[in-house]
Amino acid sequence: MTNGIEKKFKEPDQTQMLNRLWELQKSNGYIHDDNIKELANAFNVSEVEVEGVISFYHFFQRNPTGKYTIYLNNSIIADIKGFERIKETLERETGATFGTNDRTGTFGLFLTPCIGLSDHEPSALINFYPFINLNTSKVKDIITKLKNGASAESICDAPADNIRYTPPGNKTVFFKKFAPGSVISKLVQATPLGIIEELKKSELAGRGGAYFPTWKKWNSAMVQPALPKFVVCNADEGEPGTFKDRVLMNREANSLIEGMIICGYTIGAEYGIIYLRGEYWWLKNKLDEAIKEYHSKGLLGEDCGNIKGFSFDIRIQMGAGSYVCGEETALLESLEGKRGEPRTKWFFPVEKGYLQLPTVINNVETFCAAAKIIEMGAEEYLKLGIPGSPGTKLISVSGDCQLPGIYEIEWGMTIEELLGLCKADDPYYIQVSGPSGECISINEKSRRMSMIDLPGQKDIRCGGSFMIFNKHRDILKILVNFSEFFKHESCGICTPCRAGNFIIQRKLDRLNNGFANETDLDEIKSWGTIMKNTSRCGLGKTAANSLIIAMDKFHDYFKTKLDKNYDGLNLKFDMDAATKDYEEYKI
């Protein structure tokens, strides 16, 4: 850690494992055998454990990945925007095929899930710098420049924030001018209990999707006797179709930092960590610069913000490409330099979190909202939204619409209103809260978005992702993409998720090929129920959500995908076709 943190508290050496792996990956293009022994000795762990950590993360490679490592996004939004054309062009121009390097070792081509640029698809990362709105001519130009010796950094794009809508009448919560120290100055006259009461009054709930009351989490950490305590920002925004936190970090880093400082002051923590997803390497410098500015103004470090006796510091920890690390206990394991496998829930992180010490984990939007609420006051905040869901929410809109981007809506806006704002093109199927969320049909356009979660209520929660698909999109193709994503991202530690995602994927393949029957549909639902009830973490519990909901809402569509001639026997196998090559070439 930096400055005061180093002096007062030393983190165990292994917490630096991911940082060291990143250094090796970036300098060498891969992690070779000698590095394994070196790391095992440095961190006093076995070589097998080091190998286990490396193999868990998507961006750590044991084989060379080329001078220019290209990760092309293969999410469903990229797919409908021209992914296949870009994939073919990259292979043709580089001379490599995906999953390998070209013969000269210049280019390495790899696929990766959503990289947080759904409003700029198709997109890719080259040496972890963003390249957006790709087309065939742009790809040719990029590869030519790289072949001529240009660095990826020198020719990369600067993704626009695309803030399309904020509440009229200057009622935006997130995007008002915010000078460093705006909120910290208020802490001089505030007490931790006063902060808790203000957040309770505002009804702020976690914006990662679970909507747990923020004041309850902070209060639980505040009363813990163990020291030191930690504040962790979950900036591992990995849900496909979500990019709101990217925009906040790029545009409102001050709000994020002050939200973390407020939390530290409230719970009695001195140490903050931003866990930034590997796909957002290009944002790290901006966050580093913001942290330096706060240090230079006395707003971080000893006697933070001129508050005697209050010290707080922040460091950034890079993730390395693992969706499951968005789950809070998996994130904690990753912070400790281990495989990002979810913990069994004997304790909440506020009781035993990072290094088994009290830890508050909130996402970027939650910390920013907390800062803004303390700045404007709960009374003003409560004037926005609807009863039971006060305030505003950031929605990442992408897909078949003319204006993809960020929409800051007041809670209570209907699906129809949002579709109108983004100029949706003949919407038919809408995916809310990403693949792990809920799909809705255009017939449900009158539903409101809110935080209300009651049985039978018509409102819909939205964690942040809002993907729009028109009538020309194949629903099954969308769901297969989601299923492949979950199968790939499952950490594999629990059987229901590991086996369930694989089996569901096979069932969808049968459905896609016209071999499925009603029994297959029933078995998909059964496996979805098993996963929901018995998986270890939220990934497995929600992986089949959209598929099962879609099977109910679009039942007639799924009927058209079944084998109409199925009579209880599998008569599709063609022995003559299967042995054709043997008969032709046998000696």
Locations of regions flagged by a protein language model:
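Feature of Fe-S/electron-transfer and energy-metabolism proteins
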Residues: 1-587
